From Swiss-Prot:
One of its GO terms (cellular component) is cytosolic large ribosomal subunit. InterPro entries: Ribosomal_uL16, Ribosomal_uL16_bact-type, Ribosomal_uL16_CS, Ribosomal_uL16_dom, Ribosomal_uL16_sf. It comes from Parvibaculum lavamentivorans (strain DS-1 / DSM 13023 / NCIMB 13966). Gene3D superfamilies: Ribosomal protein L10e/L16 (3.90.1170.10). Keywords: Ribonucleoprotein, Ribosomal protein, RNA-binding, rRNA-binding, tRNA-binding. The keyword RNA-binding applies. The keyword RNA-binding applies. This is Large ribosomal subunit protein uL16. Belongs to the universal ribosomal protein uL16 family. Transmembrane segments: none annotated. Part of the 50S ribosomal subunit. GO terms for molecular function: rRNA binding; structural constituent of ribosome; tRNA binding.
Amino acid sequence: MLQPKRTKFRKAHKGRIHGKAKGGMHLDFGAFGLKAQEPARITARQIEAARRAITRHMKRAGRVWIRIFPDVPVSSKPTEVRMGKGKGAPEYWAARVKPGRIMFEIDGVPLAVAEEAMRLGAAKLPIKTRFVARPGEQA
């Protein structure tokens, strides 16, 4: 699973995800992509599950690019522990995703295969997504 090799700080504030994506909104590598329609924190496990679903449907033909990286540590306290006594230990890593962000890109497969692969990958994610294609491709 994806996670940073090292970080400046061990724990992060929760924060809120405001506004729309200001970068990573266009297809840069592949001919087809999966674009986020809602803001959310996508966990490393969800990214990996979506990647597996996409590559499995493509039967390892073509290429997949993951355009988001889980760089935010999400902490949680153990179950049945009273409030207070500090912040919990980092539990997993997540990526903050804003609406309009391209999360996955694929190339080297026909349109029908790409659409179905992205549909299967989107089912593993907790947000609404949209399939996008380059203007040159038959969308």
